[in-house]
Structures are given as C-alpha cells and as structure tokens.
Amino acid sequence: MTRLPNRLPRMILLIGVMGALLGCATQKQHTFTYSQPLLPEVASGYADKPGWSSKKFAVAAANPLATDAGYQILKAGGSAVDASIAVQMVLGLVEPQSSGIGGGAFMLHHEGKPNGKMQAFDGRETAPLAASDTLFIGKDGKPMPFTEAVIGGRSVGVPGTVWMLELAHQQHGKLPWATLFQPAIALATDGFKVSPRLNTLLKNEKNLKADPVAAAYFYDAKGDAWPVGHVLKNPAYALVMQRIATQGAKVLHEGDIAQAIVAKVKNHPTNAGLLSLQDLANYQAKTRVPLCFDYDVAPERYQICGMPPPSSGVIAIGQILGILNNTQAPQMPLNASKQPTVDEYLSPEWLHLYLEASRLAFADRAQYVADPDFVKAPLDDWASLMDPLYLTQRSKLITDTSMKTAKAGLPTSVRAIKTSVNNRYAPMPDQPEYGTSHISIIDADGNALAMTTTIEAAFGSQQMVSLNQDGKNTIGWISVEQRINRFQFRTNWQRRQTDCQPGRTRQTTTLKHVTHVGDR
C-alpha cells in the first residue's frame, strides 16, 4: 500500500497490481516526450509486494510498460487523469487479454485540494439498441452455453472506455490530450517484448485462433504463440492511437473504424452480433455521484467512498463491514494463533462470520443492484441497503452454522414493491468474470484516482479488427461486452433486474474505493 505525505488526504486505494513506479520529484513544465525503458521488468504469476512510499506521486498498473508510461506522464507534470490515459492505451496493447479500447471502465477521482470534490466516471458498455432479454437464449429455448454466447459478435456491446477518459480529461487534464498517446504509439510502432503472462495465456487459449486476424497477430505460421521476448509490432494500433490523439474518442464511434467494428460484429460466421453504427454514435459516458458510508474503528472514523451502481462493490463492502460490526468479529483475533502476524491463517471463527456476512451482502447485491437508469434503488437511495438498522437485522441471521444459500433482505422501501407479482425480480445467479485490470494513481497535486478497466473475459469476445485485407495490421480488441456476464441467460418466466434491454449497462462487480481517515 502506498503511503501518502501528511499534506495530502490520507486515502487507501484498493488495487490489484503487478508493478509500481513512484516519483520523488516532478517538473513544472507541461511538456512531454516519451522514452522507452531499456529493461522493463516482466513477470507471470503472483509476486508479493511490500509496499512503497512516495512524497510526490505514484502509479500502479498490471504491466511495467504501462506503469512506466504513467510514471513518465506524472514526472512531466501531468495529472492523475493524464497518466491514466497513457496507462490504459499501453495496457490495451501489451495486455489485450484484460482491457482495451473496445471495453468499458469505471473511474473514481478525488481532487487533492482541501475539500476536494470526488467524482465517479462511468464508461461501461451498453447493450445495442436491438438487444432484448432473449439475446442469450438459444433456438431450443434454453440459455446458451456461456462460451458459445461469449465468443463472436453476439456478446459485443457499445464500448465506453475512451469516451470516459476523454470526459475525465476535459475536467482534470493538464497535458494536451494528444501528448498522452505517445507511449502507446511508440510501443506499437517499434514493438514490445511478449511477456511470460501474455505468452502463457496465448498458449492456453483454445478459441482465439479461430479468428484469422487474431491468429495472424498472436501466433506464428505454425500456429504457436509468439515466444517470450518476441518483439510484437502493431502499426495499425499506432495509427488508431494517432487518430484518437488528434480527433478524439469519436473516431472509434463514427467513420471507417466504426464501420470496420460493426462489420466484424455483424458478419461473424456463426455468432453474429447486433452492434450498429447508431449504437456507437449514440454512446455517452456519464458522471455519477460516488456512494459513501462511515466505518468506525476506534479511535478512527473512516469514510469509504466507491463507485455507485451499476457497480456493486461499495454496497457489498458496506454491508459486509456493517454486518460484521454487529457480531463478535471486531473483538476476535484475525488469525488462528491469536498473534498479530501476517503469516498465520485466518481464524476459523472470524472467517465464518466474514463468509456469512458476505453471503448476506451478495444476496442483496443479486436481488437489487443494477443499472440505475433502468432500476430504482430501494427508498430511491442505494445507501438504504447500508442503513445501520437494516444491517443489524441482517446480522441476526448469522448463527454458528453456515446458512448455505442466503436470501435477500427486505429493506422497508422494498416491501410494497415485493407485494406486486408483476414487479417481482428473481435474484441474479453468479457467473464467472475475467479479463479485467486496475489502475491506481496519485499525482503531485494530490489528485487520486482508482480505475477499473475490463473486457470481461480473457481476450474479450476474441474478435480482432483489421485495417486492411491481409489481416496483419490490427487495431485492437472488440471486447466481450460486459453485459454478457450480468445480463442474464434466463428463461422467460424469470424476470430479473439485470435483464438485457436496449442501451442498458449490466451490473458489475468492479471495486474501486477511496477511504478518508477522520478529516484527512
């Protein structure tokens, strides 16, 4: 966990990273020239990180090349949002299995000045206008197998990551927009070394070769994944980066690139999709009001803020912590040996309470949380799900034995709704979720952001678009539109709050938080 100087708000950004670079000084001029690091660290698998300390700025991302791009932007005087753009564009190139310009993202941004504003930016994908709640029902009337639904055009929706970044930059950018694409352009043009992680994923992927463009880009003539250290170039990605840099996010949503994306989706030989030029042209990123709750751990009071629905993370965390506070958990040791060491296993007693609280929270999440543009919150306020009195009632359901499958609760405002059969929602079943990356950044002015960016499944919908006919120059990934994992595979009698509807954003588990300690 990165520690911040006292003059800045003390925050905790929940991150999942493999690399971090910290800066101890920054330049005042707002100019930037990208230089590629000579020996970037690459890794595959888990690496324990002890944490770092910085007095000026910090950036953490899942790939050292992306982290370095953000670091150089911050060192040149860029803002946290500036750095996030550079990081994301490089991630889309070097880690296409996790995120990219064809995906969706959330960003939580906090201004570093006193009483600074916190904002939530929503760039998650939406369902095509032609979508319906039977999109993932097969000809036999049964839900499609997950893999069959995902791979191809059917699962692709309207991407929003670049639109969201442009919106955030308009409000919080310092360096010129075009400057921020230099790292991705340079790496795509000159090439980057295939990492062990990318090589491993390519070798284990069974379906990616079915797409001729992806096969030509990621595999050699024998069909083997490019080896670790192979220099992979993508001049067409560089071209698209250059066009976004000079023309803005709109180049992905209109004109020849948009036409190529739509053609790829609609012309899939076995699993065509519904994405249209109108869908791309109509997309708008949104700003939302962050959702916050208080959490007391003597002698401190924490205010924890997160992304509101359609993200479900902050509600789930708020419920889990609130329920646990009504149990013996706060007085119990965390580990089995009753010693405050990090090397011990969690005690069975504490872990039982945590798991039961999590069951209750996820039951409510499955029942109520969805796109707020389509589904009303209980009491018209999502915070009602974290009401202390309600969580006290929920905590009484925990006993010494597992409740197995928990049932959703009934906040007061929901009781009237539940009496109407026509308005009754079935709970949302869990489904696998992969293909996601996280970015955490603090700039020299104390502005902080947490951004989760995703294409939902490994390599998204496993469709790649080419700018030419030979299939060698590619523009990047059309993501598996994230609704595939939360818009439901369901039979007609099961009405759910996450049903697929035109223009709708599905519920997501992505989690990004900023925590204030007292008045810091």
Predicted regions span which residues?
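Bacterial N-terminal signal peptides that target proteins for export
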Residues: 2-13
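C-terminal motif of bacterial Sec signal peptides marking the signal peptidase cleavage site
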Residues: 22-23
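Noncatalytic scaffold domains of N-terminal-nucleophile
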Residues: 28-68, 72, 80-248, 252-254, ...
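Internal maturation/activation junctions in enzymes
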Residues: 36-38, 331-454, 468
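Feature captures eukaryotic membrane-trafficking machinery centered on endolysosomal pathways
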Residues: 65-68, 235-272, 418-477
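Active-site rim segments in enzyme catalytic domains, especially the processed small/beta chain
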Residues: 93-100, 104-110, 114-120, 271-276, ...
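Catalytic loop of the DD-peptidase/beta-lactamase superfamily, centered on the K-T-G motif
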Residues: 301, 307-312, 321-327, 453-458, ...
